[in-house]
Amino acid sequence: MGTILDEIVEQKQREVAELYEIYTPVKTKRKTHSLVEALQQFTVIAEVKRASPSKGDINLHVDVRKQVGTYEKCGAGAVSVLTDGQFFKGSFHDLQTAREESNIPLLCKDFIIDKIQIDRAYEAGADIILLIVAALTKEKLKELYSYVLEKGLEVIVEVHDEQELETAIVLNPHVIGINNRNLKTFEVDLSQTEKLGKRLNEEKLLWISESGIHSKEDIIRVKRAGAKGVLVGEALMTSSSISSFFEDCKVNI
């Protein structure tokens, strides 16, 4: 029996085949916004996330324009947009809407397995592409990483365990994202940030913590581990006071 990640990647393969039939990349150059610059101080990457396989519908009918405007007003250093439709109910249209609303760095959050998805994300306004080590062979990861750089975009290389981390370090990427969620089981363990963070601190690499961050205590914990930022979706999409969450992120350690 396959994992949730296996199921998602199989769906992506079908989507990529369809994309080649209906989409022709446009060769254009545009201005981009840097996440690396934003991460010179502790940064919240605030996510637009309508749903997920683990939680079901989170905020299905969110007004993307309004949500992104609120994030920027509250002090987000970057915005992440889920573009997966099947499992997260997102779209490239959501990404494009976020770009129209915001001038801060914009992350395309998806399960990228092919260059054509990167072309589509670029055209929709992404500044940063997420590449997930668990979803790719080493060869494909290298190929897609190089292609993102060719497009003039930045990369977050996402890892969950020590083996994936070693694969990521070889690339010397702009940013490494420690995903506290195991994409095979979708279970969350914040101690992954502390475990893997030690190695990244030794390597003096820029890194962020992703998933499972809901409270001031969680923020303190990942800051102490050395994270330069956090990617937060569900907590913000269900919050009755987004500004309060951002205030909690300013806590000194």
Curated annotation (Swiss-Prot):
This is Indole-3-glycerol phosphate synthase. The gene is trpC. Belongs to the TrpC family. It catalyses: 1-(2-carboxyphenylamino)-1-deoxy-D-ribulose 5-phosphate + H(+) = (1S,2R)-1-C-(indol-3-yl)glycerol 3-phosphate + CO2 + H2O. CDD domains: IGPS. Keywords: Amino-acid biosynthesis, Aromatic amino acid biosynthesis, Decarboxylase, Lyase, Tryptophan biosynthesis. Its EC number is 4.1.1.48. Pathway: Amino-acid biosynthesis; L-tryptophan biosynthesis; L-tryptophan from chorismate: step 4/5. NCBIfam families: PRK00278.1-3, PRK00278.2-4. SUPFAM superfamilies: Ribulose-phoshate binding barrel. Pfam families: IGPS (PF00218). InterPro entries: Aldolase_TIM, Indole-3-glycerol_P_synth, Indole-3-glycerol_P_synth_dom, Indole-3-GlycerolPSynthase_CS, RibuloseP-bd_barrel. One of its GO terms (molecular function) is indole-3-glycerol-phosphate synthase activity. PANTHER family: INDOLE-3-GLYCEROL-PHOSPHATE SYNTHASE (PTHR22854:SF2), TRYPTOPHAN BIOSYNTHESIS PROTEIN (PTHR22854). It is an enzyme of class 4 (lyase). GO terms for biological process: L-tryptophan biosynthetic process. The lineage of its organism: Bacteria, Bacillati, Bacillota, Bacilli, Bacillales.
